[in-house]
Amino acid sequence: MLKKKGFSTSFPNEDFIDNQDTISNFKIKKEDFLLDFDDTYEQLNMTTPKGKIIIQGQENHSPFSLKSFSNLSFDYNRPLSPKTHILNIQDNNNNNYSPILKRVNKTISPSLVSSTNRFKNSLSCSSSSPSSSSSSSSSSPRLISTPPIISTPSSPMILTSSLDKFDEILSENEFMSLDNSVTSSSSSPSSSSCSSPIVIKTNATTSTKIVTPSSSPSSSYIEDAPSTPSPSKLFQSLSFKSPCSSPSSSSSSTTTPKSSINGGNIIKKQLFSNKRIQDIKIEKPSTKIDLHPSKLQIKSNLKIKPSLPYNSTEVTANTKTTTSTTTTTNTTIPTLSKNIIKRTSSVGLSPTLSSTQLVNKSSRKSISAATTTTITPHNNNSTMTTKTPSKRSLDTSNLSTPKSTSSTINKAFTTSTTPLKKPRMSMTPLSSSSSSSTTPSKFINPLPSSSSKTTTTITNSKRLSTLSKPSPITPITPTITKTTATTTTTTTTTPNKPTNKRLSTLVNTAQKPRKSYAPPPSSHISDELEQRIQEALLAEANGNYTGGSVLTHSSPQKVEQSEWSPIRKKSTLHDVHACTKKNY
């Protein structure tokens, strides 16, 4: 008996029946009787009750099925599979053609090769003639009655317009090529403007085609065939095409070819060897430019209303820009997520001069602006005036106190402090003097004699370990030209009442009466239910089990029903006795 690992086989033939030893030693295994839904994916390809191996859902009906593929006779007339055709295109294999072409294994006879050499020599001799002979012969076309040229399969150009002669040409292995003839005829310097046309006559075709190798765009030309021709490419190479004749020709084919030095036809090079890939329409980019909303220009009036918690503030930034006719301003809002706020305050005889720096490490230039800010904490309003960034605005500003804080003294008294953990970025400078916190409300308008000065430089950094998150809303710092004055006003407001978040999202907060999904309280339904319960209790006490027991949920009536009719659930006691008597 044939035994293999994992399964047992049984063959119902005569040799197996005659051998009694194998029948006595035959054992039935559990795997032989597995159903289809009992098999796992690993057991599916192992065994079947028939004793045949299943590979990918197909049975091997013969032991030589794996070897029988090499014994198949391949018919070249049938279409090749798409996979082999694609592989031939990728590898540039010239041996396999498309389904239309027949593969010819004939060897080229030496007489045909000699005829091709004679044809090339005649063309080269005629092209090397002086300009007088070529100009005189340009009026009448030359007739060449030589046999057709046999070319390599790399350029199978076929000069015939009749499709019925196509099979005959292919069977005789007559492939025409115009590459050598056109380039050799136009190689003379006298034929730079227009060379004499060539008329080629073949025995297979009845019609003749005239090829004029001139550089004009209206002249007919033949596209270069790919190394692996597809059917559409072969049918296209049968007839001559002019660039303006086909309406479906792309814009690249209708362009006038550049006149070469020799003045001959320019052979069209193809991007892809497959014609179907070449037929794909190249879509031109549309003139409409779709921009992301983040890249659009920012309008002058910005109203930022983020979703803030109760203790935070709403910031409305109004930018008023006055520019000349030639200059423009690019206002950008830098995001302050994951930044470091460096506060340096200098303590001296003059009022506090503090600076807030946000370090921005990027490839672009950092945006900086010198701002003069006065803060009134009573009204929670801050007015900020932006000036052009210069050192004069810091040093030569008019102060009510003497200028005892120069740039060198500021560096000596500079103390760096980290801001407190607040939900928003506090604009009050952190310093030892309390001059800015006790400013009266008359300093709302920005004056040159303001009591506090804040220099803000916006930059980026990555160290955030001990610092709190800054507010995502900052005043706009524009990039200003010399003839531009930009004023940014920041107004901070706090909500009046501590409102509930959940109530603010509701449209209508009025209390509606709740719908009761219970049935309406009716007296007769409840009375009927109680009456049924009492009747059932009385019937069970009296021993009449007509409707089933309420307390024990079992009755002899149901036991008798299950003995003779499990389908009929409801029946009287008389029907039960009648049916049981008939069964006896």
Curated annotation (Swiss-Prot):
Residues 237-260, 366-376, 425-479 have a biased composition (Low complexity). Residues 377-388, 395-419 have a biased composition (Polar residues). Residues 123-156, 209-264, 355-479 are annotated as: Disordered. This is Putative uncharacterized protein DDB_G0268590.
